[in-house]
Regions:
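Iron-sulfur cluster-binding electron-transfer modules in prokaryotic oxidoreductases
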Residues: 2-179
Length: 179
């Protein structure tokens, strides 16, 4: 994959709630990585927890509204929403897809979601931002060749087992990338 100039890579950064607490190293390493690669992350300070799939157990409307708000925060910056959490990417990505489909198939539902956002003084969801995982941005936007050139300490010979999280690779029909 060819690289894009790193100076053009800007994202609305959604760290998620776990990276602010139990996995602070994830937040810190993402900050250090983005700085080293020249990727600009505009942190969405007013973002809410995505609900990690639990909101929809109570109400699909709740999950869609909370995450439409998060996406709308990125849309106000005219940037794609970027997260490093596979669960956040999965939940927010599915909401984004569901609301984009609602624009065509069920505009009344989208009006309901945006009405709830408006009641809270939030910008409406428009479906213009998109949701990316950090790994997708590194591979697809930054490029593997450019990334390889930045390696300062190769880990050749290191045997490891990667765990990306299930939402990063499944459900395949809902993801913008091939595994």
């Amino acid at each position: 994959l060819s690289a894009m100039p790193s100076s053009s890579l800007r994202y609305a950064y959604f760290p998620g709630c776990v990276a602010q607490g139990a996995c602070r190293e994830l937040y810190q390493s993402t900050q250090l990585l983005s700085q080293a690669l020249g990727i600009e992350l505009i942190e969405l300070k007013k973002a809410s927890c995505c609900g990690s799939g639990t909101f929809k157990e109570d109400s699909q409307l709740l999950e869609d509204t909370v995450n439409a708000r998060n996406i709308a925060l990125a849309e106000t910056l005219n940037l794609p929403l970027l997260t490093h959490c596979s669960t956040c990417q999965g939940v927010i990505g599915h909401v984004d897809e569901r609301l984009k489909q609602a624009q065509q198939r069920n505009p009344a539902y989208l009006e309901q979601v945006n009405g709830l956002l408006q009641q809270q003084g939030c910008s409406p969801y428009q479906g213009t931002s998109g949701v990316k995982h950090l790994l997708w941005a590194l591979v697809g936007d930054y490029g593997l060749e450019a990334l390889a050139q930045k390696v300062t300490r190769p880990l050749s010979g290191l045997k490891c087992a990667a765990f990306y999280g299930c939402y990063l690779l499944r459900a395949q029909d809902h993801l913008p990338y091939d595994d």
